[in-house]
Amino acid sequence: MNGMTRREHQIFDIDKILEILEKSKVVHIGMVDGDEPYVVPMNYGYTYENEKLTIWLHGATTGRKLDIIRKNPKVFFEMECDLVPFDCDVACKYGLSYSSLMGKGIATIIENSEEKQKALSILMKTQVDMDFEFNEKLASVVGIIKIEVSEFTAKHRPLPSK
């Protein structure tokens, strides 16, 4: 990805990046539908294995999002956490402290029941930090999207020192 403008805010420590993935609960998925941008907020799960980030999404088994991915599987994602607004005596110095993660990857619609069950377990572990098992019947009524992330960057904007 292109270099970050405020490089002093960039996070390189993978443990801090994984913390953003744990704390955030919604990911915004950007797609292109023909010549029109389309962004959807979604709950997610993730795995980070062998230095490879994978994001798992669930939703309906039909709809615009899946239609777009079938035509163009390239996606962009963004998530944030630790949002803390701050004020100042000058309007232009008001702001927001946060941590964020964004990147791009290739989305695949998962049809295999075992992989869907695994994805649902990962998603629930990420969202509520509990282990759940899913069966074929439950997996059959849910659409699963797997994003194999090719690039990502993370950022932390701290609270200003007073």
Question: Where do the PLM segments sit?
Answer:
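Helix-adjacent hinge/juxtasegments
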Residues: 60, 64-87, 94
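Short Pro/Gly-enriched beta-strand edge/turn motifs at strand-loop
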Residues: 11-13, 23-28, 127-130
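Extreme N-terminal tail/first-helix region
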Residues: 1-23
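Amphipathic alpha-helical interface surfaces
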Residues: 17, 65, 116-119
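Charged, gly/pro-rich active-site loop segments
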Residues: 2-8, 82-162
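Short beta-strand segments
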Residues: 24-61
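A generic structural signal for nonpolar/aromatic side chains embedded in well-ordered alpha-helices
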Residues: 20-21, 68-69, 123
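Beta-strand secondary-structure signal
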Residues: 28, 56, 76, 104, ...
